[in-house]
Amino acid sequence: METNFILAGFGGQGILLAGTVLANAFMLEGKNVTWYPCYGAEMRGGTVNCEIVVSDTEVSSVHKQDTDYALVLNQQSFDRFIERVKSGGTIIANSTLVKEARPRDDIKYVFAPMGEIANELGTSKVTNVVSLGVLASVCEIVSRDYLALGAVSYTHLRAHETSL
């Protein structure tokens, strides 16, 4: 079975790192995975997203027109990617920065205050890691243990200790 993900936010929110951690977690679970980043010329503040396709069999293409799960950390990303979520799919949004609107009735919505949770942990820099925890709870396709292993292998120990 093939499952498609889009992770999106603005530059500086750690979207590409979150995507890398998620893709690595899938690889550690023995699944086939592709990861494709997309970002503008801006270093911070511009739109950033990555697409991940995970499957038990070989992945045919990374770029899909529709997605099963969209994880969005800001309003611009919500507005941009909501139409890419296929009927029956799920959009998971950071309610700290995204209005809790439901413009479509054929998809599921999950709003979680990811930014607020990160701030309660001491720094907004871990919003991306909080978002992966929410994603793991919602889609149940990747275990939290493998996400933690994925985080350890792609982050510095200090950032890992802060995040987890």
Where are these regions (language model features)?
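Active-site cofactor/cluster-binding pocket
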Residues: 1-158
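A short, hydrophobic C-terminal helix/tail in secreted or cell-surface proteins
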Residues: 159-164
